[in-house]
Amino acid sequence: ELPVAFDALTVVINPQNTWARTLTVAELKKMWEPGAQGRITNWKQIRASFPNEKLMLFGPGADSGTFDYFTEAVNGKAKSTRGDYTASEDDNTLVQGVENNKGALGYFGYAYYAAHKDKMAAVAVDAGKGPVGPSLENVTNASYSPLSRPLFVYVRDTSAQRPEVKEFVQFILSRGDLVSEVGYLPLPKTAYALTLKHFQDGKLGSVFGGVPKIGITIDQLLAMEAKL
């Protein structure tokens, strides 16, 4: 289990939407929970001060890890969500849906928001301590919760001794600077050094088993990985 980056799941709206630049986790749940299906269809139902505007939702399909993490973080259970939204595994389809509909709201990884900032606005999410937007700083200081998540590379123990696998792992853990180039958020250098040492020492096991803990911080991640 090799932690390589953090991602900030980003809730986005159409640029013409001037009323929902901040939303609480409870309001997101009100939109996305299973009981909202066929019932919550207007922005005014989310907050009384919002306009009478049709709510249109866009998000990844059920086979996506982003879907699993978002539904657990917001609704309390992975894969628990309303079904009457526009789902796609192609993030470009989601971008276009939000871009072309004033009342749209969607979510995906930070990379797609960063690549299309001119077409949409990011929502600052309030988990109880005030609204916080997605950024490297806010993921690093643990204030962007619960929508920040660690990303991992998993290596089979029987493959770890192959020269090309060793070379690949050495490369990805020594070039954390490349992480930001593809829209993800790099870990501290100490994290990459610790992970590389674990790999070189042949430490096996997984803290998360492929399912990261909701709301975990970088410091918590490092502490847990250090115990492997």
Region spans (language model):
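Flexible loop/hinge segments at secondary-structure junctions
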Residues: 1-228
